[in-house]
């Protein structure tokens, strides 16, 4: 198939008192709910509703809501006009490093009035630590300017001319201790007392922080924690083994450039906390620069917390139903949370299909997308968009729900190949395209049968959303598949997504990024240049103290005439 690709706290804080911010503002992001927001800030949904008269559970992206301070968690503070990193650190009796370490997403660019940050409770910086703070006032050394001595000038007259003391002038020019002032001498004029100290700008402070963190590693140490199934081979184990194999291929490519990389593989067993803690207790774990895994939800928080405390990049490779990134600054969630993806799809679908007639068809097959479809309908209702829901059993009557002269978009409730084929076969029998503009909107699973149903996908100009897409016709994908078969004597397991490619994308992006940026990887994640085989990445912090979520969502559109359009959003 010819393919066209378009990548479109009153709180007492270490002895410092300050005006309390009892409530702070939160701007709702796509996919967030009152519950997820309450969990993020350590308060209850009712606590939030008490601060927002009339607030319902139906919140929208972009909406601003008031959130009360948690009595036990970190203090949330909104930067005020005119404040600097140093002035805030003085207010809370801590160093600027305490603040920037707690808010790794903070930068000179977003340090401005209205920005929300966290201040760790119970942290105190000594007077000596605050004096050594990179944001603290610094003494200017050297000469402010030079002066050519004229006839009849004296040390006294020159010191008065430049508002410096005679002692300071002599100190800056030791020759004056032993020699008299002479015409033609060039003197160093020191800074006056009122100009002797200066406070570094926020730009200077953040630049220095970045410089200190950006030290490259002589050797990169990586831990991979996956359920390899060493005791018992399962479908999950086979997929995770493919992921590991793809990861190793990426690492080998990076090693070819001269990088020194050590891989430590650990078997993820069971679902109890003790099994994962046994891995984390290994002395070498604290030396890791990257931890890939685990994949089981019961283990993710423990590893994320360990990585958070030890400043280790932690990749959550598969789960969409965890919230580790909310409170763990070094966590990266490869698969966007389902709420985010769903909400994004609803909004983008309506934006792209304004005015279309939408028909939901309830198929006989069981749906794995019941929550998604329920949310889809609720979203359309909230936007006053009418739609039709009908049973597949009455499909012969679908024409009465379709409209001529406008686009009709059919959304089946099931994502299987059988459901798709059943539906389009009925459409063919009814010759619907003779009288109506008709298209189907589906699911990521449609990739599993796209090769066998290419003609029908093209005929009905089908579209589906996904966060991953592998194009077998791309030379890079073909080359990867050859390397995989050549190195491991077997092809990737047929699955959706393909776990070998997922592993390669994770390895190339994270190990490659850490190799290039060292300890500054998280501050430079947006500068990592990598074109994915299957899983495109755009990692964004939810806030200044959180970890990262991958925000990429794609729409795959069959345009007819053997053309495919890929619309990438992030």
Predicted region positions:
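Bacterial Sec-dependent N-terminal signal peptides
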Residues: 1-27, 565-570
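Primarily a LysM-type cell-wall glycan-binding module
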Residues: 18-42, 69-95, 132-165
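N-terminal, post-signal-peptide region of Sec/Tat-exported proteins
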Residues: 39-76, 111-112, 176, 181
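N-terminal post-signal-peptidase region of extra-cytosolic proteins
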Residues: 46-53, 97-104, 167-176, 424-427
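Extracytosolic ligand-binding ectodomains
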Residues: 124-163, 167-168, 172-570
